[in-house]
Each structure stands twice: as C-alpha cells, then as structure tokens.
UniProtKB/Swiss-Prot annotation:
Keywords tagged on the record: Cell inner membrane, Cell membrane, Membrane, Stress response, Transcription, Transcription regulation, Transmembrane, Transmembrane helix
Phenotype when the gene is knocked out: Cannot be deleted in the presence of an intact sigF gene, a double sigF-nrsF mutant is viable.
Role of this protein: An anti-sigma factor for extracytoplasmic function (ECF) sigma factor sigma-F (SigF), which responds to chromate and cadmium. Overexpression leads to loss of response to dichromate. ECF sigma factors are held in an inactive form by a cognate anti-sigma factor.
Membrane topology of this protein: Multi-pass membrane protein
Stated consequence of mutating residue 181 to S: Up-regulation of all sigF-regulon genes, even in the absence of dichromate stress, increased expression after stress. Greater up-regulation in the absence of stress, some SigF protein mis-localized to the cytoplasm
GO cellular component, one term: plasma membrane
Gene: nrsF
Protein name: Anti-sigma-F factor NrsF
InterPro entries, alphabetized: Anti-sigma-F_NrsF-like, NrsF
Length: 214
C-alpha cells in the first residue's frame, strides 16, 4: 500500500470515530503539565512578593492572555496534527497574529521611549537572562508528556506535530511563569517570553521527528 493510500485510510477511520480522543488526551497533558509547572514555580522560583497587587494591574493579565493565546494556538495546531493528514493551519494563523500584535506593540513601546537607555531597560527588564531558560525548564515535563501522548495518536507530520506540542506546552507554562515574573512591558514579553515558547517548539519538533515516526 502506498503512503498516501495509508494516510487516506487512517483519515477515514479517524473520521468514523465518535470519541474525542485527541482533545481529551491533550487536556490531560495540559492538566498534568500545568500542575508540574505550577509546583516548580511555587517551590523553585516562588511567586512574586507583590502578586496580590500585581493581579490588580492590566499588564499581569495582558501577559497571561498573550501566553494563553500562544498555548491555544499550539493546542489547535497539535489537535489537528495528531490526526492523519492534519495541517494545523488555524493554529498557525492564530499564533502568527498573536505574536505579530505583541511584537508590534513591543517595537512601538521601544521606539517611543525617551532615549536608548530607556528602550534597553524595556528590553532587558530585570530578568532577561533567566526568563527564556526558565520557561524552557518549566515546559519540559509537559512537552515530554505531550510527545508520549502523541505516540498513541496518528500524526503523519511528526516534526510539525512535535513543534506544535512544544508551542502548546510553552504557552501553558509561560502563563504560570507569570506568577513569578515581575516584568511588565510588551518589549520584554514579545522577545523573551516568545523565545522561551519557541525553544520548546524547536525541541518538540526535533524530538517529534524521531519519537513520532511510524
């Protein structure tokens, strides 16, 4: 049987199924991975001391919405890619639009700063060296769980499915990382948060090529 014929047969079988297995499995991955990340945030990094005050401000929720939407984009992509012949196009479009909007806001914030030093302060914040690596570490447990779950599904684009799972994981854990992170600028968010999420995506894509092959 040719590969295209096999994919078509699997897609037909998947279409006849009545149980939403991928959404249910991905929800379980998000739940377990989110709990693991939350425990790491609270036990290792600890919540920011002014959290009670921070949640009253708009930027705390802007960060959560941004990373949450990145996670949603990754979920939509991996949910489709977990099925034979899926492309994840809707997820990619949402992710690109969300990142683009944040990047534009970050660039505008930087170029309207009074001077170069102020722009660099927006970019570096207080934790630019540690932000992306910490998001990466927080997301590894969820990414590992997600790749394991994908092995029980039927992705026909393993590298892309792994990349989407990495973005899903990164969005979830970056949202929880906001409980610790004191940064509050679009410039910082667009660069360092996004890099942490992207790093998980790249690792997921690399691992998926090997772990999710048929």
């Amino acid at each position: 049987m040719r590969t295209d014929d096999l994919i078509d047969a699997l897609a037909a079988d998947a279409g006849r199924g009545t149980e939403p297995a991928p959404p249910r499995r991905l929800a379980l991955v998000a739940g377990l991975g989110g709990v693991a990340a939350l425990l790491l945030v609270l036990g290792w990094l600890q919540a920011r001391p002014d959290l009670g005050q921070a949640i009253l401000g708009p930027m705390f929720w802007v960060k959560a919405i941004y990373t949450g939407l990145l996670g949603l984009a990754g979920y939509l992509a991996v949910e489709r890619l977990s099925r034979p012949g899926g492309s994840g196009r809707r997820g990619w479009i949402i992710g690109a639009v969300v990142f683009g909007a944040c990047a534009v806001a970050g660039i505008y914030q930087a170029i309207t700063s009074p001077d170069v030093q102020a722009a660099l302060k927006l970019l570096h914040g207080y934790s630019w060296r540690s932000c992306s690596p910490r998001i990466l570490v927080l997301g590894l447990p969820m990414l590992a769980l997600g790749l394991w779950a994908l092995r029980g599904m039927a992705p026909t684009r393993p590298g892309l499915a792994g990349f989407a799972m990495g973005l899903f994981s990164g969005g979830v854990v970056a949202t929880l990382y906001g409980l610790h992170c004191p940064e509050h600028t679009f410039t910082f968010l667009a660069l360092w948060y996004s890099l942490g999420v992207l790093a998980l995506g790249l690792i997921g894509g690399w691992a998926g090529r090997w772990l999710l092959r048929w």
